[in-house]
């Protein structure tokens, strides 16, 4: 069995920026779609999968249509669930609680939210279903969880890569169990 190549594309900026958007269904700025389509046009894709949240799904619809490929929505590619913090500006959250979360999202998840291990587990399951030459339009947290699953990096290690809006992360998935892989490309927008 050969290695599979998959590409993870972070959705474009949401309409309201600067908020913790986990499962909050905030639409993206649709104007970003042409740039995102241009970014993936050369990838020889066969499949397009997207998170079911609007900020990813709407852009996935445009990309799949432009490429003439079917689209599959998969809620396992959603962002981390921020629970009671979902949709809030970080400044409105208790600084000590937010700091504990960023330092250790496993032991200090948001109130009513998802642990890091839960995000990793659902993304791991989603990765296992991917076919080669697949584009997944998703969220930064899910992309970081995929990196953690495939490379063994912990939650601190995956933050070493900047994954801004519209970042395209290309991965080679090795056959076998457990899942493993390597980063083979990262494309982001030029610095402003």
Residue spans for each PLM region:
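Generic structural signal for well-ordered alpha-helical scaffold segments
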Residues: 37-41, 120, 124-132
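Generic beta-sheet signal
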Residues: 6, 129-141
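Short, active-site-adjacent cap segments at secondary-structure transitions
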Residues: 15, 56-57, 79, 142-145
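Acidic, low-complexity terminal tails and accessory targeting/binding regions
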Residues: 1-5, 65, 80-91, 132, ...
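Amphipathic, non-transmembrane alpha-helical scaffold segments
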Residues: 53, 116, 120-124, 160
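Active-site-proximal alpha-helix that buttresses catalytic centers in soluble enzyme cores
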Residues: 3-69, 114
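Short beta-strand scaffold positions
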Residues: 50-51, 121, 137-138
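Phosphate-handling substructures
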Residues: 26, 65-122
């Amino acid at each position: 069995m050969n290695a599979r190549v998959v590409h993870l594309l972070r959705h474009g900026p949401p309409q309201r920026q600067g908020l913790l958007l986990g499962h909050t269904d905030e639409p993206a700025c649709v104007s970003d779609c042409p740039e995102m389509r241009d970014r993936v046009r050369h990838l020889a894709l066969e499949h397009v999968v997207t998170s079911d949240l609007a900020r990813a799904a709407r852009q996935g619809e445009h990309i799949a249509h432009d490429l003439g490929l079917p689209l599959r929505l998969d809620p396992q590619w959603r962002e981390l669930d921020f629970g009671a913090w979902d949709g809030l500006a970080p400044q409105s959250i208790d600084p000590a609680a937010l700091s504990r979360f960023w330092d250790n999202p496993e032991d200090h998840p948001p109130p009513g939210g998802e642990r890091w291990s839960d995000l990793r587990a659902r993304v791991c399951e989603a990765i296992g279903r991917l076919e080669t030459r697949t584009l997944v339009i998703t969220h930064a947290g899910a992309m970081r969880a995929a990196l953690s699953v495939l490379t063994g990096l912990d939650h601190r290690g995956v933050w070493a890569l900047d994954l801004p809006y519209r970042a395209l992360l290309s991965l080679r998935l090795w056959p076998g169990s457990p899942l493993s892989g390597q980063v083979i490309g990262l494309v982001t927008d030029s610095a402003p």
